Amino acid sequence: MGIVIKDNLFYIHTKDSSLIIEERDGDLLLKHLGKKIEAYHFSNTVFEKDHAFSANPVADNRNYSYDTQRQIFGVHGFGDFRVPSLILQHDNNDLTRFKFKKAKIIKGGIKARGLPNPHSSESAQSLALILEDDLAKLRMTLYYTAYDDNATISTFVKFENLSDKPVILHRALSTMFDLPASHYDVITFQGAYAREKTLRRHQIEQGLFKIGSNRGASGHAQTPSLILTEHDSNEFYGEALALQLIYSGNFQAFVQKNQLNEVRLGIGINDDNFSWDLQANQSFETPVALITYTDKGLTDLTQESHNFIKRHIIPKNFANKERPILINNWEATYFDFNRSQLLGLADEARKLGIELFVLDDGWFGHRFDDNSSLGDWFVNEEKLGGSLDSFIKEIHDRGLQFGLWFEPEMVSVDSKLYRAHPDWVIQADQREHTYSRNQLVLNLANPDVVAYIKTVLDKLLTENTIDYVKWDYNRNITNIGNGRTYLETQMQSHAYILGLYNIVSYLTTKHDKVLFESCSGGGGRNDLGMMCYFPQVWSSDNTDAIARLPIQYGSSYLYPTISMGAHVSAVPNHQMNRHTPLTTRGHVAMMGNLGYELDLAILTKNEKKAVANQIKHYKKIRSVVQFGKLYRLINPEVGINEVAVQYTYDNQVLVTYVRIQSTIEMMETTVKLRGLDADAIYVLIETGQIFSGAELMYAGLTIDMPQGDYLSKQYYFIKK
């Protein structure tokens, strides 16, 4: 059973882990979060004693303090001086003291209203822990859902105003919990535009370690997740805990080590630009957070996260569906194209075995550069040489699927939409606009804007046979000030995200056969919130094969390969001005959902033959990459000059190795494979050589490479 209640103990069990909570005198205390325990008898009791300067909420007990108890929801104002979970203003203060009232076991999953949620299953079970502050007349319900097919717990919080007066939320985390003192590291995934998801590992010291975004989106610079792990853990050893937020807006995540070396973790909506007006009898629900645990190292944590996302996050109709190999015209043409050029690109793509043609920015309004037309989602027939419908038909007649680029959340000042509705943009009254990429952001907190976007895009998707949509978001939000009051303005950032989810939920439900790819200048909104609706993410605008290695490597820790778009582009690369071999560009792009983004027509005969062979090969290994278990064999951040990853699926094994820089007088690299059947025989398809699983895992595979920079090698094995 996923949920068990025994006396004053609440057990939340996954297939391998347990979260155990004690109710004591109305307080909820965390007793264990880790390896599965069926029966708990307080072996790790916190010995209570009088700590100096620790406040005591009970007058006659100097040994009991919220400052030293391990909690699952940090109280505010009664002696817990750590980061609180909640700040809620009522009357003349923001003190809250919630006490436990009752618990309920619920079959299946519980969904947060208006927000993305994991898909539930019949075997899932949920626990509702209901607490109330009788003085302030507030109710707080903590929801936990356990999944028996995974080591993940999903959780969120619901706040209800039971009083007859309004209250204001200033902080509302999705989850928070305290862990015993130990030597911990925190892993985060940071970066910037065109270098997203770079792995960073820090040792936790006393104080506060915090990441977040206040950009209106999850952003390129940080990811709404963190991993807490034992200091000496590695890929295949040690305890690790992942905390992820299913949300696409402003977020915060933190690890805090207090004066007693106890550690608190939390994740949720960022306090910056957030408050929420909770009127009498109204409620507020936080985004859902995920807690994933392993005691088998970071690779196992990765595989648990990948499995959960594929089973419970990615839309079901695409979770187990192979992704098409695409050609995107952006780096081939940018804004400068006509019908003849595009059809020529499609002809070349068809000959090479590509399956999907994507028409990127520049097909609508009078858009010949990035100065105009966002919001005017009607085809420029003069530029496209006819109607959109006729162009799509020509693509389909070539045996290719058709995809189209949109940026629905944005508007250009030079557009019919802006001239008709200048009040629809995010803008503080009497302030000048702040531009980015020459565009403004539509106010998705406005129901009229939401209705307009839904209507326009629904019409386009209904009237045209579009197989794929690339949904872009090319700037962050500034000048927030559309509210009639300051409080209403503080609600705008979260209301924007709720409006976004309203739109994408509607469109992806109605057009459920369309493959949507999320993009924000690459990975500027690469998060689980978007992934609940869009099965694929353009993980970076950087298409350079070498620059992509740490981006894709970092992405792999929590996000499955099938969610990641990766393209072969021209040399010199348009972002890095680097020359890399076509073979290496292909191998790196094959670490994700393979695509091409270059002018195929100008390739030499030999290059076209090489691309055709890449595509033919990828079609053989596509299921291994997109559905297989991933093992990281060499970390580019540690190995400096090389990276190696392995995918295993059914009886197939694929190893991809990339050398970044060559060195003189060095022995060849040997990598030890993982997760094989030690007693089985594996055939290397390229040469016909045979190896035992034990040999490949324990002796290793020596990489046979010539001298030179930016070289790569793939090894494809079949288990006999």
UniProtKB/Swiss-Prot annotation:
It comes from Streptococcus mutans serotype c (strain ATCC 700610 / UA159). It catalyses: Hydrolysis of terminal, non-reducing alpha-D-galactose residues in alpha-D-galactosides, including galactose oligosaccharides, galactomannans and galactolipids. Transmembrane segments: none annotated. Homotetramer. This is Alpha-galactosidase. It comes from the Bacteria. PROSITE patterns: ALPHA_GALACTOSIDASE. The keyword Hydrolase applies. The active site is at D472 (nucleophile), D541 (proton donor). Its cofactor is Mg(2+); NAD(+). It is an enzyme of class 3 (hydrolase). Gene3D superfamilies: Aldolase class I, alpha-galactosidase from lactobacil brevis, Golgi alpha-mannosidase II. Its EC number is 3.2.1.22. Keywords: Glycosidase, Hydrolase, Magnesium, NAD. Belongs to the glycosyl hydrolase 36 family. One of its GO terms (molecular function) is alpha-galactosidase activity.
